[in-house]
Amino acid sequence: MGLDIYIEKISDYRTDEKGRTVSTRTQIGNLHGCSNFLDELNNSLNSGFGSGATYSFCEGKFFAVRKTLIEDLAESEKKLESNDFSDLYRFANEDDEKFNKRNKEYIEDKIRQLKFEIKSLDEFFKENDIEVISDEELDELIENGGEDCYGEEFEVSASW
């Protein structure tokens, strides 16, 4: 039993009655039986795997931009290096030492998870012939790609 990856087009961003940003998702394709994909990724699929990359489809090929994960990793590493956790949650009556220790462990764990997700995504992209490109390259591809290129955002979901 392999992992089935579903690619959805994201469109029509709007705010719902509770003030949350929501969008319309239309399934446009899937990649079946990705059995070589890392089993451990199952744990991270429900915690934002899809938000890790933006996808586009051009001339029969998928392209991916991992900007969100890369930026989050850089920001987390910078936060750990500077030891500045001031924007993170502080429990009531928590002294500075406990606060810093707890948040340092949290950031270290987050960095490990992000590195794992980036590595897993890269392996998935390689196995499925999805090229990783920058935002600028994606914009240029869409602009110059003609009718077979879609400029919408795509996201991945998965089922086992």
Give, region by region, the residue ranges found by the protein language model.
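Acidic (Asp/Glu-rich) sequence patches and key acidic residues
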Residues: M1-W160
